[in-house]
Amino acid sequence: MVRSTLTLLALFNVAILFPGKAMSQNSEGREFNGKYQKEYLDKIAFPIGGIGAGMFCLEGTGAISHVSLRHHPDVMNEPYTFAAIYVKGVENGAKVLEGQVPTWKLFGPAQSGLGRGDKTYGLPRFEEAVFQARFPFATVDLKDKDMPLAAKITGWSPFIPTDADNSSLPVGVLEYQFTNTSGKAIAVSYTYLTLPTN
């Protein structure tokens, strides 16, 4: 018993001293603290907003959820709000700036048993999304074979270590960046939609 405890302590100390080797991969092979893609995007919700000032979350796919304002935490709140892009002259050139909707959302949204879909899941979205978090920043990179551009969403909060006043400002930022990957000029229209709720 004592010997196995000492061995565990020694292994723990090695992991602390050499985190790059001891903690670089988990049992499924995803890199520790690396990028999230495919099924690893399904349950990510990165909080954005000032400390104690309400929040919304940037999901792994780029969707907005968990909108909690005015001291009312509401982690199931998914408003009718999304960014979209249209590329002129491209077939299938209009898409929501999000990755594919996770399967668990399609078959289990809140109150779906009451016949309330209240979702925008049927709109076309980008095929691939890659999420990476480096607090207080999170990025979602979007790609699609139909689109002659790549999109990047960067979400961040006003977090300044040792500065509680400025870190608690009621601010959350989403930046959208587009890169033309076609090699020729394209005409693009971007919009951010907020639709009324029922």
Question: What residues fall within each predicted segment?
Answer:
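Asparagine-centered strand-capping/turn motif at beta-strand->loop junctions
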Residues: 177-182
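Beta-strand-rich N-terminal accessory domains
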Residues: 25-106
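Boundary at the C-terminal end of the N-terminal hydrophobic targeting segment
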Residues: 19-24
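Conserved small/polar residues in nucleotide/adenosyl-binding loops
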Residues: 191-197
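Bacterial N-terminal signal peptides
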Residues: 7-16
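Extended, loop-rich substrate-binding clefts of extracytoplasmic carbohydrate-active enzymes
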Residues: 106-171
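Positively charged n-region of N-terminal signal peptides that target proteins for export
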Residues: 1-4
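Short, hydrophobic/aromatic beta-strand segments
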Residues: 186-190
